[in-house]
């Protein structure tokens, strides 16, 4: 790999990476029930999931003009998930109404050894509790199929660094997510309209403090203070014989993007 400083050749690197990844047996338990009582359908789903993995990485970065780098890192991750969902559905006035609740609890710990004197090691813990209630209605109004829904979420996200609670990175969200769709036909043209709001939460890998080594000038790290992305989506579709027209609009609030920052103040990099 050739590295340039402006137009001048700065250095030439040969990088070798050897990784040993051990994934321990995961444990998954599920309880499911489906039944019907007086025309009311009931679905109950409960899951328990636990797993952990360990990765050891050896990096040799050989330089033509400067010192060689030899780096060994060790990372461990432990995950536990408890989740349950209950849905009740009942026919009502020519349509159907369904509602229910779901709850999930996630406990995740990740430890990272760091890179010797170059990058500091980290020890993170995440606890997330998500409680949701939802209601959906489906009706046929004349020649139009209509459905509407509303979902409420109450999320607690607690972040710990080196066993200390971090109030700035911990979050509490309360959100409503509506949805609406209409489908029908005008002559030989079938049409559909839809609108909904959804959320895309950061992956845990994007939230942890551990730093991934690219080369001696490039590090990749997470950001515990990342916010969820809220997506407003609207769509219109029309079909006539073999022709299909689709128009969509999406608006992203707090979208997650990669950013590049230059570090010049010190050799030890912490996230």
Residue ranges of each PLM-predicted region?
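Outer-membrane beta-barrel translocator domains and adjoining extracellular loop/strand segments
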Residues: 1-14, 54-65, 109-118, 158-166, ...
């Amino acid at each position: 790999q050739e590295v340039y400083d402006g137009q001048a050749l700065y250095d030439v690197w040969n990088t070798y990476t050897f990784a040993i990844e051990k994934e321990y047996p995961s444990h998954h338990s599920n309880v499911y029930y489906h039944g019907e009582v007086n025309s009311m359908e009931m679905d109950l789903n409960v899951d328990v999931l636990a797993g952990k993995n360990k990765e050891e990485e050896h990096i040799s970065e050989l330089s033509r003009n400067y010192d060689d780098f030899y780096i060994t890192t060790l990372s461990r991750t432990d995950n536990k998930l408890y989740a349950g969902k209950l849905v009740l559905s009942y026919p009502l006035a020519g349509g159907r109404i369904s509602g229910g609740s779901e709850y999930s609890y996630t406990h995740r710990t990740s430890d990272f050894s760091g890179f010797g004197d170059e990058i500091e090691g980290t020890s993170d813990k995440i606890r997330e509790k998500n409680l949701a209630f939802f209601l959906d209605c489906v009706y046929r109004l004349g020649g139009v199929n209509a459905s509407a829904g509303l979902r409420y979420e109450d999320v607690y996200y607690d972040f710990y660094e080196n066993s200390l609670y971090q109030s700035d990175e911990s979050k509490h969200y309360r959100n409503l997510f509506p949805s609406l769709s209409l489908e029908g036909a005008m002559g030989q043209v079938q049409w559909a309209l839809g609108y909904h709001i959804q959320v895309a939460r950061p992956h845990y890998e994007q939230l942890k403090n551990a730093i991934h080594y690219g080369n001696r000038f490039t590090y990749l790290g997470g950001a515990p203070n990342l916010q969820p992305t809220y997506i407003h989506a609207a769509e219109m579709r029309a079909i006539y014989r073999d022709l299909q027209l689709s128009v969509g609009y999406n608006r992203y609030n707090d979208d997650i993007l990669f950013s590049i920052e230059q570090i010049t103040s010190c050799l030890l990099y912490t996230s």
